[in-house]
């Protein structure tokens, strides 16, 4: 199945089964704005809980805050967002559509990479166990040609971005023959800058109002609270401050479902450390965050690091953790060494001293910062894309199953009375009433047992418990496993123990410790 077709099916599945809806749907929606449905919000909350506990529970020196979306406007001047938070935009004169020039070029680089991947996959299929991928990549003329073009384009693009050379970005687009996906033409305008922050007015009247911004990131709320947290928590370096919250960016090219939106949610942690130790902590957090992802069991081969060649104005090192989505490897998390830029800027613009007194060195200094920043929505999409599976069964039928990491599944257990009579629904409800205090449990009695299994498969429920006539006599039930469809008879008294051991967030946290 083509990757594009797979992605369309995943988007459709999300709406059909209550994961994601187009926002304002009865008004024909609002472009690139989505609402999370009853199953989507549970999955999203489980992702956030997993992240929060991995930060705050596993690290005694990391605490959390929840800062305001509206902040003093000078904060964004100090952080550089007012002057430097821009995207290079280009318009197609025929379609009247606007695009990010850098994204058009990155997509072109991705096309070269995809050609190489297809050549490798074709050869692997042809030669089987005797296939030497490394040798094939080093010797195959077509692969070498695609790789040469990819490397040359990447080098040229990186130089243009580093120099903010908009004329060169446009020339790259023209030289590569990049066409507008709607009009199919190359009739491009010049490239220009566009600030990504949403602004609004705060005040009782237009004359007395103050221009403020919807925050484009949650990080600045952490930086301006550094002293508040450090002093009230009696925190000693190194320590971290974690936060989960909404951020807003006026993306011109919002696309690929929930991957790139104008309203999104971030999970960020700023780790404050002694100057000179930042690269040691940068390395630590790279590996620790990768372990967090890999503990989900979505295939270590689906992750890779992408080190930045062009660094943001605040960073001295940066890398992305990328995940293999249907449209290529894309960033799901960034790890950055932000130096002391942010704290120094806020000290300068606020006129307040933002220093840490180190009792061991008997001196004041501005801490350096390592940031980990992950998009909740991108993580949600990664989990959905990896989990969506179409299976052909031995009996000739098929099923769609979401093989979600069990700890993240919206519903952990569905209790299904075999028939909706003879005291079975009442017995099923008794089981639900016992299990619901430990993990999310539902009851479903409508339709045949086979159809109910398929519905639970489609929303990723790891366990189904079938209550039948024998249950009333011996207090045993049939426990069905989602991925294998294996069924076994178990006592009701053991249900909680069997299921909880596999679906708790604790089981994931232990895997992180094992990987570290």
Residue spans of the language-model regions?
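NTP/phosphate- and nucleic-acid-binding module
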Residues: 1-516
């Amino acid at each position: 199945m083509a990757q594009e077709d797979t992605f369309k099916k995943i988007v459709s599945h999300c709406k059909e089964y209550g994961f994601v809806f187009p926002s304002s749907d009865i008004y024909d929606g609002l472009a690139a704005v989505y609402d999370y449905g009853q199953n989507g919000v549970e999955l999203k909350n489980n992702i956030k809980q997993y992240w929060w506990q991995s930060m705050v529970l596993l690290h005694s020196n990391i605490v959390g805050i929840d800062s305001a979306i509206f902040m003093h406007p000078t904060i964004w001047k100090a952080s550089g967002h007012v002057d430097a938070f821009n995207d290079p935009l280009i318009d197609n004169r025929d379609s009247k559509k606007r695009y990010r020039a850098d994204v058009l070029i990155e997509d072109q680089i991705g096309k070269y990479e995809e050609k190489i991947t297809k050549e490798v996959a074709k050869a692997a299929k042809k030669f089987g166990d005797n296939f030497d991928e490394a040798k094939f990549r080093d010797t195959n003329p077509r692969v070498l040609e695609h790789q040469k073009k990819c490397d040359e384009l990447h080098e040229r693009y990186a130089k243009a971005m580093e120099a903010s050379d908009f004329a060169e970005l446009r020339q790259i687009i023209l030289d590569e023959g990049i066409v507008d996906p709607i009009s199919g033409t190359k009739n491009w305008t010049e490239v220009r800058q566009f600030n990504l922050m949403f602004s609004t007015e705060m005040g009782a009247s237009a004359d007395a109002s103050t221009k403020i911004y919807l925050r484009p990131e949650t990080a600045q709320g952490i930086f301006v609270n550094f002293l508040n947290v450090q002093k009230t928590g009696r925190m000693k370096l190194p320590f971290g401050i974690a936060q989960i919250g909404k951020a807003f960016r006026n993306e011109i090219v919002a696309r690929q479902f929930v991957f790139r939106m104008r309203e999104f949610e971030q999970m960020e942690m700023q780790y404050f450390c002694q100057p000179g130790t930042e690269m040691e902590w940068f390395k630590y957090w790279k590996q620790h965050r990768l372990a967090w992802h890999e503990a989900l069991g979505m295939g270590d081969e689906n992750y890779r690091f992408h080190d930045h060649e062009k660094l943001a104005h605040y960073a001295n090192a940066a890398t992305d953790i990328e995940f293999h989505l249907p449209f290529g490897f894309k960033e799901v998390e960034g790890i950055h060494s932000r130096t002391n830029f942010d704290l120094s800027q806020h000290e300068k613009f606020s006129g307040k001293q933002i220093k840490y007194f180190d009792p061991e060195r008997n001196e004041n200094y501005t801490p350096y910062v390592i940031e980990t920043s992950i998009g909740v929505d991108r993580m949600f999409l990664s989990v959905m894309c990896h989990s969506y599976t179409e299976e052909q069964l031995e009996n000739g039928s098929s099923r769609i199953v979401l093989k979600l990491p069990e700890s993240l599944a919206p519903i952990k257990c569905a209790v299904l009375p075999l028939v909706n009579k003879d005291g079975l629904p009442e017995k099923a409800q008794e089981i639900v009433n016992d299990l619901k205090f430990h993990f999310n449990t539902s009851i479903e009695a409508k339709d045949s047992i086979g159809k109910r299994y398929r519905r639970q498969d489609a929303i990723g429920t790891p366990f189904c418990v079938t209550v039948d006539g024998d249950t009333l006599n011996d207090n045993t039930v049939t426990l069905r496993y989602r991925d294998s469809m294996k069924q076994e008879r178990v006592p009701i008294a053991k249900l909680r123990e069997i299921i909880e051991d596999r679906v708790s967030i604790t089981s994931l946290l232990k895997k992180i410790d094992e990987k570290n």
